[in-house]
Each structure stands twice: as structure tokens, then as C-alpha cells.
Amino acid sequence: MADITDIKTILYTEKTLGLQEQGVVVIQTSPKMTKNGLKEVLREYFGVTPLRVNSLRMDGKVKRFKGRVGVRNDFKKFYVKLPDGVSLENGEA
């Protein structure tokens, strides 16, 4: 079962702010989160039923630090279409 702790952040970039005008919110989560799990979390904790959820898996970037190679954590991004007049500003519906 998905949990609210699997949601890392709501992304705020130029691209996502443009999408918010169309009612789409971009959420970054742990890789184990599923579409149905995210819908369940949004209904339970925010009281919002999304119209559509699209997901994509992002591999962690390879980065160098002090001569050593490391890898950042993998994550999933979800594009969530919300009903008109509903937003998730500041983590609240």
C-alpha cells in the first residue's frame, strides 16, 4: 500500500508552473509508488480525486565528488491532472 511518506515533493520549475495553469501538478515520489497508489494517497490525505495520472521513471544521474563516482537516487515523476478549481498549493488541496 502506498503512503504519504513516498511523496518526496511537488516540483516547481518553469515547465511545471506552465502546466499548473492547465490544472496539471507534477509530483516527485519514490520509485515504488504506483499510479493507483498515488490516486489513493491524494484521495485519502488531500481529498482530491485526480482526473488523469501519467508517470515516468527517472534514473539517478551519475555525479563525481572528490574524484569518486556516485549515483543520485532514482525517482518517479507523476503528472496529475486535477479537476477545475482544485490545486495542491503548499501541499494542501
From Swiss-Prot:
InterPro entries from the UniProt entry: Nucleotide-bd_a/b_plait_sf, Ribosomal_uL23-like, Ribosomal_uL23/eL15/eS24_sf
Keyword RNA-binding (UniProt): yes
Record field: transmembrane: none
Superkingdom as given in the UniProt entry: Bacteria
GO terms for biological process, alphabetical: translation
Keywords carried by this UniProt record: Ribonucleoprotein, Ribosomal protein, RNA-binding, rRNA-binding
Residues forming coiled coils: none
Record note on quaternary structure: Part of the 50S ribosomal subunit. Contacts protein L29, and trigger factor when it is bound to the ribosome.
NCBIfam families assigned to the protein according to its UniProt record, in alphabetical order: PRK05738.2-2
Role according to the record: One of the early assembly proteins it binds 23S rRNA. One of the proteins that surrounds the polypeptide exit tunnel on the outside of the ribosome. Forms the main docking site for trigger factor binding to the ribosome.
Family: Belongs to the universal ribosomal protein uL23 family.
HAMAP family noted in UniProt: Ribosomal_uL23_B (MF_01369_B)
UniProt protein name: Large ribosomal subunit protein uL23
Chain's gene name: rplW
